[in-house]
C-alpha cells in the first residue's frame, strides 16, 4: 500500500458511519410506530416512556440528517433541487414523520395553510428544517403547536409556534450566528439553527436569500420560529 492509499479520510469515514446510523434509527422509529399502533400505552408511565423514546430517536435521527447535509455542503456535494411544491404537502409530510412523537407526548398540532399555496424550493431540505423545528418544539412545548404558512411581502413564510417558555435570549440575539446559544454544559450546540441558516441561504432569488427569525410571545404564548423563502 502506498502513502496515498494509506491516508485515511476520517471525515468520509465519519460521514459513512453517520449515514448507516441514520438508516438504523429510521428502522427503530418505524418499529416504535408499529409497536405503538399495535399496543397503545396502558398507563401514564408507559406513555412517558414511549414519549422519551420517540423524542430521543427523532432528535438523533434529525441531527444525523443535518450532519450529513452540512458535510455535503462543505464538500460542495449538496445542491438545491428547486421545484414547485404545495407547501401544505411539505408540512403534512413532516407531521406524518413525527406522528408517533406527537401521540406519545399528547401534542395537539394546528395547521394554518391554504391548500393551494405553492412555492419554489427544495422540498427535501426545507422539509428537513421544518422537521427539526417540530422535533425541538415537541420537547419544549406544553401541549400545543401551530404551523402557519403564508405569503408575506413577496416571500413565503413558514412559522412554527408552541406554548412553551420561549427561546433563550442568547438565541434571540443572534439566531443566524454559528455559535448562537451554544452550551456544551447543557448539551446544546444548536446544530439545528446552523443547518436551517445554511439551507435557507441556499435558496435565493436575485439578490434575496432565505433567512429565519426567532421571537417569543407568539400566537400560542411561547416561542415562534419563522422561515422566509424568496
Task: Report each predicted region and the residues it spans.
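Short acidic helix/loop segment immediately C-terminal to the autophosphorylated histidine
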Residues: 32, 36-44
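Short alpha-helical segment of the dimerization/phosphotransfer core of two-component systems
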Residues: 55-63
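Conserved micro-motifs of the catalytic ATP-binding
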Residues: 75-80, 118-121
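Conserved catalytic submotifs in the C-terminal HATPase_c
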Residues: 83, 108-117
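A conserved beta-strand-to-alpha-helix junction within the catalytic ATP-binding
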Residues: 83-96
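Short beta-strand/loop element within the Bergerat-fold HATPase_c
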Residues: 144-154
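Short conserved segment of the HATPase_c
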Residues: 167-180
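Glycine-rich ATP-binding loops of the HATPase_c
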Residues: 201-218
Amino acid at each position: 500500500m502506498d502513502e496515498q492509499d494509506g491516508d485515511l479520510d476520517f471525515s468520509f469515514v465519519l460521514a459513512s458511519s453517520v449515514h448507516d446510523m441514520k438508516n438504523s434509527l429510521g428502522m427503530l422509529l418505524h418499529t416504535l410506530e408499529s409497536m405503538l399502533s399495535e399496543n397503545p400505552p396502558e398507563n401514564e408511565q408507559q406513555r412517558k416512556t414511549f414519549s422519551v423514546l420517540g423524542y430521543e430517536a427523532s432528535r438523533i435521527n434529525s441531527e444525523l440528517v443535518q450532519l450529513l447535509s452540512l458535510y455535503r455542503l462543505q464538500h460542495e456535494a449538496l445542491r438545491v433541487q428547486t421545484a414547485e411544491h404545495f407547501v401544505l404537502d411539505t408540512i403534512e409530510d413532516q407531521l406524518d414523520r413525527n406522528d408517533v412523537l406527537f401521540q406519545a407526548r399528547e401534542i395537539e398540532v394546528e395547521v394554518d395553510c391554504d391548500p393551494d399555496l405553492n412555492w419554489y424550493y427544495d422540498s427535501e431540505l426545507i422539509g428537513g428544517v421544518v422537521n427539526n423545528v417540530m422535533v425541538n418544539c415537541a420537547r419544549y412545548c406544553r401541549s400545543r403547536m401551530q404551523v402557519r404558512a403564508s405569503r408575506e411581502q413577496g416571500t413565503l413564510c413558514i412559522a412554527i409556534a408552541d406554548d412553551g417558555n420561549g427561546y433563550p435570549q442568547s438565541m434571540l440575539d443572534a439566531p443566524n450566528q454559528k455559535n448562537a446559544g451554544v452550551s456544551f454544559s447543557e448539551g446544546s450546540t444548536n446544530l439545528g439553527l446552523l443547518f436551517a441558516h445554511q439551507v435557507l441561504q441556499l435558496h435565493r432569488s436575485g439578490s434575496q436569500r432565505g433567512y429565519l427569525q426567532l421571537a417569543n410571545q407568539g400566537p400560542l404564548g411561547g416561542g415562534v420560529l419563522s422561515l422566509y423563502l424568496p
